């Protein structure tokens, strides 16, 4: 063996020895086992602690961002239902868990499920996540403290009211026992009137402001925002069609060019109207914070036009049933560059089928073949439901609701669609 060959041999042997020591290090495998246990427990806590719609949101958000790794064959990955595997520094995760505790570790795992790449998880990112968790806990504690104070305040008000009632009753008894009631009556009546006015003033702060009519719907939940941040949308006739009566819808579909809707029974049309007649969603879609609710599901070309799909997680309550799923919005741009909504539907979706709902290939295959882009469209800001339909929109911190009510008895809710805010990505 020449000196050169001997040198190469020794280098290979040294490298093999180091790699073998790395692979067979008991300390390393114990560390990996500990990290795996921590991550598995965090996943379990995350999934068990979420409502169905929250878990759908987590899976959908992560699925939008993840891609299959080249090392896996596509078929194998699909069979295993893996979206992605993540390579992350196990020492970093273990140190983070020991330094900050389980809540920060759980948030790190949640961010991985939401699509955070392992290469982006470093010490600086861990510290940032820890700061977010601390701030979240602080706000939670403040909210708890505020709730306790409000509860104590309500109890004190009730106690004060009870004491006033007792005092009033005692005065009334004393009054009945006195002589010369006629002389003292006016002053006592004035005193009772003053007490009554004070009680009414105290209760005045508890009266809620009445909802205001906005764009054909009653809107609750905060001041009306300026139009500066609102987005432009138009509504295609095939979407507006679902706001009509079932009989009229059937008549128009039977005369139309879309084969998928021709010949449907009136019962089928009524069932489909429940999930398609959700045009009130455009109030949210046009708002400046629509991106907090809707995820971009990608673009593709079909039927001669470029289309874009957006989805949001939601729940539909109707007929005593509650269904979780996604709100689908399909758009194309008209000649002026304004997005036209040609597809709008609530699709009931289970945890197991969320992958198909957000898969661009599946979405494209199931989409309508050709949309008549020349048909007259309506500006979304001018849309008003047909006369006799009573609905209102309610915007809250983490959700947006559309509530349909019985026009004859507005206390009766016929249908409710709730659109949920997307999970927080750090």
Curated annotation (Swiss-Prot):
Looking up InterPro entries in the UniProt record yields:
DUF3654, UPF0329
Which ranges are annotated Basic residues under compositional bias? 220-230
The highest taxon in the source lineage is Eukaryota
Compositionally biased, Basic and acidic residues: which spans?
136-172
Q: List the disulfide bonds.
A: none
Q: Where is this region: Disordered?
A: 136-230
An example of a Pfam family matching this protein is DUF3654
Q: Which family does it belong to?
A: Belongs to the UPF0329 family.
Query: What is this protein identified as?
Result: UPF0329 protein ECU06_0040
Organism of this sequence:
Encephalitozoon cuniculi (strain GB-M1) (Microsporidian parasite)
